[in-house]
């Protein structure tokens, strides 16, 4: 299993911010149509010494789905970067030991 994470900062280089409404609309239009499950987390972090809020989306997928999922999330990251004038958006892929308890 792999965990693929998309970490979206909410500060703009011009000093603006990505509002709750703006990021929720992005999630609704650009992320939710592509995935049947996944987790969103509100976070905080630093970018170039500046504090910023972040929105994190992560999904656990089978190894056979990891490449396609990572490619899709990289496309989503690029749309977020362009739409909200971000310097960069982080996509991380981590090997996990995960079990679904059903």
Identify the residue ranges that each predicted region occupies.
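Terminal, regulation- and interaction-focused segments at domain boundaries
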Residues: 1-18
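Generic alpha-helix detector with strongest preference for long hydrophobic helices that associate
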Residues: 7-8, 12, 38, 57, ...
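Short, catalytically relevant binding-site loops at active-site mouths
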Residues: 11-14, 45, 97-98
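Ordered, soluble secondary-structure elements with a strong preference for glycine-centered loop motifs
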Residues: 17-22, 67-70
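Short amphipathic alpha-helical segments
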Residues: 22-34
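Short, intrinsically disordered low-complexity segments
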Residues: 33-63
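Helix-rich interaction surfaces within compact, conserved domain-sized segments
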Residues: 53-102
């Amino acid at each position: 299993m792999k965990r693929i994470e998309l970490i979206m900062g909410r500060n703009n280089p011009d000093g603006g911010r990505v509002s709750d409404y703006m990021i929720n609309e992005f999630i609704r239009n650009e992320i939710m149509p592509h995935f049947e499950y996944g987790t969103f987390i509100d976070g905080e972090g630093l970018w170039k010494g500046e504090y910023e809020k972040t929105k994190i989306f992560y999904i656990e997928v089978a190894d056979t789905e990891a490449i396609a999922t990572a490619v899709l999330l990289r496309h989503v990251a690029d749309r977020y970067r362009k739409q909200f004038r971000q310097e960069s958006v982080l996509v991380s892929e981590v090997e996990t030991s995960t079990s679904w308890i059903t």
